[in-house]
């Protein structure tokens, strides 16, 4: 086995602004050729714009707050999750996240795939 790349430490102050979606603040911690990881914040009573993650599979861990995920035909599939819960978003699934609560939500997001990590769209198909 050859020499591996060194282990990296990315403290909060070294995260960089991630891809923009209205209503969300993404902070990129790690981006490699096939993986993206970061921290996402959504303000109280905000809802993100509709988007998908191209060819990426996405795993979302809710650190704090309440998250309302809308997806499916006309956005009619709705899931609410809280601290300790995970979401799985398959490649190409159009969705948006909302924060119905009174406190900012904090999420850890990890994506595996290639191509654009965020594609903003007008809305889901009917």
Name each model-derived stretch:
Residues 47-49, 68, 87, 91-97:
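Histidine-centered metal-chelating micro-motifs
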Residues 59, 88, 103-119:
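A short hydrophobic beta-strand segment most commonly corresponding to one strand
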Residues 41-43, 54-69, 110:
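Short, conserved beta-strand element in jelly-roll/cupin
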Residues 1-39, 118-126:
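A short, N-terminal "cap"/entry segment at the start of jelly-roll beta-barrel domains
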Residues 21-22, 38-54, 91:
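Conserved short histidine dyad/triad with adjacent acidic residue
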Residues 39, 52, 71-73, 99, ...:
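Residue-level recognition of conserved beta-strand positions in structured domain cores
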Residues 75-91:
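Short acidic-glycine-tyrosine-enriched beta hairpin
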Residues 33-34, 55, 74, 102-103:
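Short strand-connecting beta-turns/loops that link adjacent beta-strands
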């Amino acid at each position: 086995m050859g020499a591996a790349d060194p282990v990296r430490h990315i403290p909060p102050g070294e995260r960089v602004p991630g891809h923009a979606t209205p209503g969300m603040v993404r902070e990129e911690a790690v981006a490699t050729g096939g993986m993206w990881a970061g921290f996402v914040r959504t303000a109280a009573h905000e809802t993100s714009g509709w988007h998908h993650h191209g060819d990426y599979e996405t795993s979302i861990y809710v650190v704090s707050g309440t998250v309302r995920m809308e997806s499916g035909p006309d956005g009619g599939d709705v899931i609410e999750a809280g601290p300790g819960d995970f979401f799985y978003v398959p490649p190409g699934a159009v969705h948006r996240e909302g924060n119905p609560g009174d406190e900012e939500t904090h999420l850890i997001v990890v994506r595996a795939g290639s191509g654009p990590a965020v594609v903003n769209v007008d809305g889901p198909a009917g």
